[in-house]
Amino acid sequence: MPAHVDAPERLPQPSAAEMDLPVVMDALSDPIRLAILHRYLVDAAGGERSCGWVGIDRPKSTLTHHFRVLREAGLLEQHLEGLTRVSRVRVEDVQQRFPGLLDLVLDWQVPAALLREGIAS
């Protein structure tokens, strides 16, 4: 049995200082990505969840794209646990760089069409 456990592999993301407002706004311009971030803020309570937890009925390649855009904008942190990608909102970094942005996401009303598709709760 190994004396230590290797840390999960963290996927590339910008530092808080490297987060760029146009990139963040572009990431949030898609209602599915906005709904993903909203769901993590509301239902994950700052914790980590697998990408499949979101429960979006879309092809895996589409979900991978949406999560990658959110991660590359600096909104989500992702790491690998085996074959599973685990994500969490980078609350502290986003609040530091763009104060009030996550409050706007929390206040956003998820469109009924997305709710019917099971995209957000």
Residue ranges and their predicted role:
Residues 2-21, 38-43, 80, 90-121:
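Amphipathic alpha-helical dimerization/coiled-coil segments
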Residues 20-59, 81-93:
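N-terminal helix-turn-helix DNA-binding core of bacterial DNA-binding proteins
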Residues 30, 66, 99:
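Conserved acidic functional residues
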Residues 36, 63, 71-74, 88, ...:
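Sequence-pattern detector for short linear motifs
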Residues 48-49, 66, 106:
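Short linear functional motifs in flexible/disordered or boundary regions
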Residues 52-75:
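Canonical helix-turn-helix DNA-binding module
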Residues 75-76, 83:
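Short, Lys/Arg-enriched C-terminal cap helix and immediately downstream tail that follows
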